[in-house]
Amino acid sequence: MDPIRFGLSRVPFAHCYNKRVIFRANYLVPLTWLKNNVAYKSTNTLLLPTPNAEYYSTSKLSSQVNVSLNSLSQKASSGSKIYPFKNSFPLPFSRSILPIRSLAFLKLCVRHNSTVPSKDEQAQDISKINTNGTLQTPNKKVNVFRLFTLARGQGWNFFIAGSLLLVSSGVTMSIPYIVGKILDAGSSGDSSVTHIMGIPSGTFYIGLLGLFFLGSACNFGRIITLRLLSERIVSRLRARLFAKCMSLDGAFFDFHKHGDLISRLTTDSSIVGKSLSMYLSDGLRSSVSAIAGIGMMLYVSMRLTGYMSLIVPPIALGAFFYGEYVRKLSRTTQDALGDLTRVSEEKLANVRTTQAFLGERQEVNRYNDYIRNLFVLAKREAFASGIFFGSTGFLGNATVIAILALGGRMVAAGDITVGQLSSFLLYTVYAGGSIVGLSGCFTDIMKGLGAASRLFELLDAKPKIAPTVGIPVPVTVGKAILSFRNVGFAYPTRPSASIFDNLSFDIHPGTNVAIVAPSGGGKSTISQLLLRFYAPSSGKILADGVDISTYNVHQWRSHFGLVGQEPVLFSGTIGENIAYGKSNASQEEIEDAAKRANCSFVLSFPEKWSTQVGTRGLQLSGGQKQRIAIARALLRNPAFLILDEATSALDGEAEVMVDKTIQSLMHNRSMTTITIAHKLATIRRADQIIVVGDGKVLEQGSFERLSRPGTNFYKLMRWQLGKVEP
């Protein structure tokens, strides 16, 4: 933005070589490289000619940029407004002519984002994703039998748990019958009961105590077995899901947010594991108890059982509809929980940006909206559960009252004894409780099916780029000519916004090729296509005439080293991050790669190579993270080295030192270097420059040829250097 137009004071943080920013400053405040105090404060006109000034000494580090800059700017016609690429939006910078104070700090360089589509384009793309997305699988109903496939190989554990369940349930269901016999013996009129069921009373009660101990022991064993079985299933399921995620291509992660995938790996897998163990066990126990209870009720009195059976159809029908409702609601709830996890992960990861723009209240309100949605779903389930279980409880209690009334008449008529009526009532309570429990287990299993549908979506996802399928990559691939032939590409989430259209060029082995394009022109997309994170929509990418899509992806990527513009580090030590690309690397190799990438700062840390970098490397500066990323790439000694604006996060001094390392690598003709950059100092060292714009190659050639007036490269460099006002 133009600070003059909006009446703002601008405080840019810039590298010393970024004179397009520095020349517009009214005041310069250079910071020393070794200290955090201000070295000088003056206007740029006073600092530039002073050899002892900090700005002068640091600006000399990029003198090679100035040579090319001056050679271009001297040939330019003043006042011309040239910007050669459509669909790109240059920012309206202008030289300050009004007395507005601004400061330039020589530290940080700001990169502008790419073209943003219109709202209509975004809506059109989203509608296509929802209807035609190749990775958006429909919400299929998962049957119980497929759910059991997740527990494959656990048959022996299920057999043990089932056997223990039968024994413990048998002991439990014998209690009403035994109680009835004790009551009949006590109501016989004999003052001293010596035998119960033909067994001496003392022996009977000791045996009864032993029976209860057996039931408790079996119940203990069942719970332990099923808990371990549940954790085993969940652990194996999570490992399988995570391995599946690691095998999917970039298009999948464009469609599915990380927070939703984390929710599937954690919450959904836990629900499914419990459904296959604890809930299934409870359901089996309720089934056994209900069947045994009804059988004993028939044995005691078929007449009372006939009256009792009138309650079964409405309860069974209600349980079926309730279970189906909960299954669908569970799927919706798990989706909402996945959205909540996604938002939490995204907002917490960018909390500093939120705080910098005072967006705390906005983000809290947005998070509360997701919580409110989840609460509404939980409230719907609560009302449904209350209606179902309240109704079944009322019907059960009403049935008990009816049984008492009818049973009392039958006792008075002498059709049954008091003990038999007591046993029947206890069996009624047991059977009724088991039926209600069975309904609850059915509900929990339906929840498991809802969660399982999300897991099977992930397990059934088929990437367009299979990681382990394809022919072996020849060992001589490092000397191959890489060719783009009429390549067309659009990101899967935005199929209507074409990035490339008939893109064609060659990269010869052992050369240093620079890819140049305006912001949003597809520079980084070329590296993603080369690494096969995505597949071209049309055309082919060849290696010595062989389509790289026929190669094994893992083997193909093993020949590449990548240094991205945004360094990515993992939690762990510095040494572990450098050795990430080569797990068997020795300490010597790690230190050598770090030395070549100018990671001398590691030796200043107390723990040196064992220093923890923190989550995503937050304990290191941007430049330190970038140099570790460079060392990680160099450790592999790749045949193809992709530098995607690899020095963008470094300060001037560190960049020059790393550039020397990269420059020495470029002289190594056994390695092909593909540089994606916008800095003139990096571009001018390339053997070949490929200028990309409007989805195709506009021109290619050497720096000397393309830097002539009239070329697209010349116009782009003039705009980047601030010599042309857009």
Swiss-Prot record:
Protein's UniProt keywords contain Mitochondrion: yes
Residues covered by the ABC transporter domain: 482-719
Glycosylated residue positions: N66, N113, N132, N502, N584, N598, N668
GO CC terms: membrane; mitochondrial inner membrane; mitochondrion
Residue sites binding ATP per the record: A517, P518, S519, G520, G521, G522, K523, S524
Membrane topology qualifier: Multi-pass membrane protein
Any one GO BP annotation for this protein: oligopeptide export from mitochondrion
Domain ABC transmembrane type-1: 158-447
GO molecular function, one term: ATP hydrolysis activity
Coiled-coil features, chain-numbered ranges: none
Protein family: Belongs to the ABC transporter superfamily. ABCB family. Mitochondrial peptide exporter (TC 3.A.1.212) subfamily.
Annotated function: Mediates export of peptides generated upon proteolysis of mitochondrial inner membrane proteins.
PANTHER family attached to this UniProt entry: ATP-BINDING CASSETTE SUB-FAMILY B MEMBER 10, MITOCHONDRIAL, ATP-DEPENDENT PERMEASE MDL1, MITOCHONDRIAL
UniProt protein name: ATP-dependent permease MDL1, mitochondrial
Organism, scientific name: Schizosaccharomyces pombe (strain 972 / ATCC 24843)
